[in-house]
C-alpha cells in the first residue's frame, strides 16, 4: 500500500482524474448547501486504497493506518486475521462491550478479505453474539444473512477462522454443540438445497464433522419460508425456518473451501483445525475425472444439465464439430471472457454476439463472448454440397441462407490465465501457426514474409516440410484424429482408384486440384469423411474438387499419380498414420474440443426499479397503477374530498430553528429538520430518548398522514420554472428508507422532462455486460487520434507517436467505453443534471453537452450489484456492441470478472449530487448496490486476485505448447508466462501489456442476440431446435428432451399448482385477496377483482411440449409425463358433462 508505483505518465493520469473529481465535489457541495437534500455535502467518501475503503465501509476509526502497516509486512489473509485480533483486543478502536468489539473485529477482517468492496461485511453479517455452552463457558455466535453470498466462498470460510482467531485472543471458549443441534444443521442444509441452490452440497457426515468441530457457532437469520420438520423449537436456535446465510457459509464456505482454510491454519500454526484433513480427504474421493486420470480429460456435461428454452446448445461435451480450443489472448478477451470469430456469430443464427454469456464445459463455468477475427471461423456444408470455411463476416452474411450443416463451429480463444485461475489441467493445444513458427525459426533462416508464412501456398508448405523437416503447416493439417482406421483406408483406396490429380499450368509444385466423382463419393460414404477431416472442397460438374490437394494426397500415402507409395502402417492413431505415410511431421489439428451452450444474452439497458420511478416521493394509491404524480395532484378520495389530498406514510419532522413541522429534509427557513419522534403505542412525544418512558417501545417519526399534495406539486413546478404539461411523472407507492422522508419533488419533474429513471438511492444508472479491453484504436471508439491525444494517449504499443486513427494503444486502467445506446441515455442524464444545477440549485451547469461527443472525457462511477464501493472511471469513447468495455483492472476493482456479469455506470456529478444513504431501504441488503465509498485510484495489488492471472505476452513460449501435450497443471509453467502477478509493485503493472491475437474490430458481429430479437418463447424454442439440427456437434433430440425436462415441464407443473393456490387482485388499487370478495368488487376501492394466474398461463407450453415430444421422439417417460399433465389441465378447465348447444339443436329437439 502507500504511494502508487507507476510511471510519471500514469501518475499524471491519476492526478488528473483526482483533480477533476475534487473540482466536481466542490461544485456538488456548493449546490447541496442550497438544496433540499438530506445533507448539505456530498455523501460518498473517497478512498485511495483498500485501507480507506475498509474504514469508510465499517466505520472503525484508525483502522486504515493499521491495515497499511500490517499489509506492508504480511499477506492479505494474515493481515485480515491480525487486524481482527487487534480490533477485538481494543488496540484499534474503542467499544462499549466485548461483544461489540468482537463484532467489529469480524466485520473489519471480512472487509479486508473482500477488498473493502462488497457489502457482505455490513449486510452479510447481521450480528455477532456471545452464547453459553452447557458447562457455563461462553462461545461466539456469528449470525450470517443472505448477502454473505456476495463475499465468495473463501471469504465466508475465513470469516469463521477470524472468529476463532479473535476468540483465542480475548479468551472466549469454543462452541460445544448439542447432538440435536448437529442434526438440525444436517436437516436444514439439505432442505436449503431443495428450496434455494448451493454450489456445493456436503454429505450428511461432512456436515456433522464441521458442526461438531468448528470452534465458532455458525448461526443466521431465517431467510426462507420453509421450516424444518424435525429438530424444531431448539433452545439455542431461535427459529424453525431455514437460515440461508448459515447454509451458505457452512456448505459453500467451510466445506467447499476447506483446502484454502487449511493452508491459512498451517501458516498461522493454529491448533483445533485438524478435522479439516478428514474433510479434505472426503472431498478428494469425489474429485473430477481430470484429477483421477491425469493423462485423459473426459467430457463434462454439467453445463447442459439445466437447459432453458430459446438458448441453444452449440456443442455437446467435447464432441467433434464443437469449439476447437485455441490458446491465446486478444485485446478484448481474458479474465473469463473468450473469443470466437464474428463470422461464427452470424452463422450460428445471431444467437451469440459480443457480451453473450456461454456456459462452457471448461476451464470455468461460463464466459462472455468477444469477436476475434484472427482465429478460424466455422466450416459449413452448403446446400450445393460445397464445404467451405467462413472466416470473414461479410462472406458469412452472404452464405448464411445457403448453409445446410455446420460441420465445425470454429475455434474458441481462451487464455492461459483462465486455466490458471480455475486450476484446470492444460488441455493439449492444437498445432497452430503460433507453435509452427517456433519450429520453423529453429531450423530455417530463410527470410519469408510473415503473411506468406501465415497463409502459405501448398508448394511453400511442402518445400519447408521436405527441405527443413519443419512439421506440415497447420493450414494443410487435417483432422485425422476424427476418423477411424476403416474410414482412412476407405478414403485412401477411393482416392487412389477413382481420383484424378489435375496439375495447374504454370503453378508451383502442389498447387494442383484433386477431382473425385461426386455420386460414388456420396454412395461409398467418402464425402462425409472429407467433411470430418475439414478438407475444403467444391461440388460442380458431377465432381468434388479439392484445391491445393497435394499435401492431402501425400498424407494418404499416395504419390502425384495417386499410386500407393507406402503401405498402410499398423497403428490405430490416424495422425501418426498420416505422418508415416507422408514422411512429414504431422500434429493434431484439434485435440481439444469445448462444449458450450448459451447462457444470458448481452445487456445494455437503462436501470429501472420495478416498477420504474423518477422520484422517491410516496403517493400510495393516488397515482393509480402507474404511480403517476400528475394523477395524484388531481386525486379525490370521494365526492366531497379535497382535490390532491392523499393519505401516505411519511416521517414527521420539525425545524429546530422555527419549530415548523414538515415532511422534508429542509425547512422553508433554510434550516435542516430533525425527526419528530413519538411512541407508536402511547402517542406521546419522545425526544432525546431511545425508548418510550411509559411502555419502553422504540419511538418512530413515521405515521400515516393526510398530505395536501396539490400545492406541493404546483410549487415544485414553479421552483424549477417548468409548466405543468407533463403526462406522467413516476413516483413510488411507499418509501423504504428508515425515516420515510422523500426526495425533493423538483428532481422528479426534471427527470421526467428528460425521460430518465432512478434507482433506490436517487441515482440514474445504465447497465451493461462486462467485457475486458486492454488495447484500443481511435477508429473503433467513434473518435479521432487527435481526441485521444487530448486524453493523454501519446504513443502506440510499439512506442511510436500516436498520429493515425488505426494505431493500437494501451488502454488506461480507469478508462471505459459505453454502447451508443448507453451514451444517448447518459447524454439525457447530463442534460438533466445541468438543468438541476441551474434551475433547482441555482449554480452554473457542469456538462454543457449537446451531443454524445461532448461526453468524451467525462468522469463516471462504476458499480457492481453486490458491492458497496464505486470506482472512478473516465469515458473515452463508444461502441456499437451492447456491452461496457473497460480495463480488466476496472472490472476487478468492482470484484467482477467477465464471465457474463453485468454492472452499471452513472455520471459522476449525478452520483455525488443525488446519492444519499438516507434514501437506502431499511432492510437486509439495502446497502448493497450503493456507492457507500468511491475508489479514486486503482491499485492492481488490491483488485480481485483473478486479474493477477491475466497473461500479457505477445506470443506464448514454445515450452507452453509442449506443456499442454503433457496435460500439466498450469501452475507448473507459471514462471515462464508474463502474468500481471509478476509485475505487481512495478511501474509495468499498468503499462506495456501485449496480446497474442488481434482483432480488426472489437464490435464486429450481430448488434443484438437473436434471443432478444425473436418474439415469443415458442419462436425462440423453434429457432433453438432449428440451429441444433444444423450443427454436427449437437444432438437435437437430446436438446429437445432436456428442454422439456428442465424448463417446460417444471413450468407447466408450477403454473398448475399456482393456479389452484392463487390470490385475487384489484386492477384499480392493487389490493390482493386470498378469496374473491362476495360482492365481486374490491371492498377498498370498488374496482374489479381479477385472477392473478390465468388459464392461458397454465396451458402456455402444453401444445408445444406435445409437438416437440412427437417430432423429436423423446423418451416414453417424458411423453407420459406430458400426457398426464394434459389430462390434469383438461380436467381442471374443461367440464365434459356440459355440452354447448346451438339454437338449431334446441329447435330440432335434440336438446331434450
From Swiss-Prot:
Highest taxon, organism lineage: Archaea
Entry keyword set: DNA replication, DNA-binding, DNA-directed DNA polymerase, Exonuclease, Hydrolase, Multifunctional enzyme, Nuclease, Nucleotidyltransferase, Transferase
Keyword Transferase: yes
A Gene Ontology biological process term: DNA-templated DNA replication
Catalytic activity: DNA(n) + a 2'-deoxyribonucleoside 5'-triphosphate = DNA(n+1) + diphosphate; Exonucleolytic cleavage in the 3'- to 5'-direction to yield nucleoside 5'-phosphates
GO terms of molecular function: DNA binding; DNA-directed DNA polymerase activity; single-stranded DNA 3'-5' DNA exonuclease activity
Family matches, as InterPro entries: PolC_DP2, PolC_DP2_cat_dom, PolC_DP2_central_dom, PolC_DP2_N
Pfam family, one: PolC_DP2_N
Enzyme Commission designation: 2.7.7.7, 3.1.11.1
Signal peptide: none
UniProt xrefs under HAMAP family: DNApol_II_L_arch
Function: Possesses two activities: a DNA synthesis (polymerase) and an exonucleolytic activity that degrades single-stranded DNA in the 3'- to 5'-direction. Has a template-primer preference which is characteristic of a replicative DNA polymerase.
Assembly description: Heterodimer of a large subunit and a small subunit.
PANTHER family noted in UniProt: DNA POLYMERASE II LARGE SUBUNIT
Membership in a protein family: Belongs to the archaeal DNA polymerase II family.
Annotated protein name in UniProt: DNA polymerase II large subunit
Native organism: Methanosarcina mazei (strain ATCC BAA-159 / DSM 3647 / Goe1 / Go1 / JCM 11833 / OCM 88)
Primary gene name: polC
